[in-house]
């Protein structure tokens, strides 16, 4: 049995076959990128009716971008994982995609919307890194634009010991994913194991470990306001963890 490991911290790895399996696994769990992109575009337009451009930070394999391109004249992405970015580039050959870190990127232009979805923000290690990322988001959004962030669970909403499991099959490959979540200080530790099987490949085993910070709602709001953005939290969202929206030019406002 082959064994590989990818460990994600503030620089989440998401490399090798884990990156290749990413979309198959999450779509098998019911993630609907098309619907999420449509809802996200509607949210952006609610705050910025003339929005024409969007930057997706931590764009992963570019699944959201593929659908967002139908709603905005210009879409760009930023991704830390080189392997995830390579998949995104294959999927979105006409989009400009950047290899970079949400804590310190500088693209030299602004967008109608800056988004960071699927709780990618949780890979940051603490308040200083969260503040740095929101400052970068604010620096890349137009004065009449909007910043949208999907958080990880708040501490009071996290379920220690949570186990998730599922099996998906596509193109002759079967993947079973099992994860276990535990509390590790002010963060979630998620251990994930995959069994991947196919007629010609046999069975391989892969595992990854992620530490995802359990920021409080107040910590997110502090980062938004420090970056000069008003902030509003909306319950629900794509994964049930809610969404934060921020508008430029209203430092210190929380709604």
Swiss-Prot record:
His-123 is a strong candicate for an active site that hydrogen bonds to a water molecule which in turn hydrogen bonds to the C-3' amino group. However, it is not conserved in related S.venezuelae DesVI methyltransferase and its mutagenesis does not completely abolish catalytic activity. Belongs to the methyltransferase TylM1/DesVI family. Its EC number is 2.1.1.235. SUPFAM superfamilies: S-adenosyl-L-methionine-dependent methyltransferases. It catalyses: dTDP-3-amino-3,6-dideoxy-alpha-D-glucose + 2 S-adenosyl-L-methionine = dTDP-alpha-D-mycaminose + 2 S-adenosyl-L-homocysteine + 2 H(+). This is dTDP-3-amino-3,6-dideoxy-alpha-D-glucopyranose N,N-dimethyltransferase. The lineage of its organism: Bacteria, Bacillati, Actinomycetota, Actinomycetes, Kitasatosporales. GO terms for biological process: antibiotic biosynthetic process; methylation. Pfam families: Methyltransf_25. S-adenosyl-L-methionine binds at residues 14, 22, 33, 58-59, 79, 101-102, 117. Homodimer. It is an enzyme of class 2 (transferase). It comes from the Bacteria. Coiled coil: none annotated. S-adenosyl-L-methionine-dependent methyltransferase involved in the biosynthesis of mycaminose, an essential structural component of the macrolide antibiotic tylosin. Involved in the last step in mycaminose biosynthesis by mediating dimethylation of the hexose C-3' amino group. Pathway: Antibiotic biosynthesis; tylosin biosynthesis. Keywords: Antibiotic biosynthesis, Methyltransferase, S-adenosyl-L-methionine, Transferase. One of its GO terms (molecular function) is protein homodimerization activity.
């Amino acid at each position: 049995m082959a064994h590989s490991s990818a460990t994600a911290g503030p620089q989440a790895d998401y490399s090798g076959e884990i990156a290749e399996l990413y979309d198959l696994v999450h779509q098998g769990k019911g993630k609907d990128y098309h619907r999420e992109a449509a809802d996200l575009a509607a949210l952006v337009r609610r705050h910025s009716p003339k929005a024409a451009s969007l930057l997706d930070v931590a764009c992963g394999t570019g699944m959201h971008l593929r659908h967002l391109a139908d709603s905005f004249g210009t879409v760009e992405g930023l991704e830390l994982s080189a392997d995830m970015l390579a998949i995104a580039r294959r999927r979105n050959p006409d989009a400009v995609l950047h290899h970079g870190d949400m804590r310190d990127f500088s693209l030299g232009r602004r967008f109608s919307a800056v988004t960071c979805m699927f709780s990618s923000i949780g890979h940051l290690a603490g308040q200083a890194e969260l503040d740095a990322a929101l400052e970068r988001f604010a620096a890349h959004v137009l004065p009449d634009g909007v910043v949208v962030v999907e958080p990880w669970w708040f501490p009071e909403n996290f379920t220690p010991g949570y186990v998730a499991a599922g099996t998906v099959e596509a193109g002759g490959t079967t993947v079973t994913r099992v994860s276990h979540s535990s509390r590790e200080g002010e963060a979630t530790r998620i251990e994930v194991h995959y069994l991947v099987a196919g007629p010609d490949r046999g069975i391989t085993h892969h595992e990854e470990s992620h530490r995802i910070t359990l920021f409080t709602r107040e910590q997110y709001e502090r980062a938004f306001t420090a970056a000069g953005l008003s902030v509003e939290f909306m319950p629900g969202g794509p994964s049930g963890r809610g969404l934060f929206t921020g508008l430029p030019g209203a430092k210190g406002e929380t709604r």
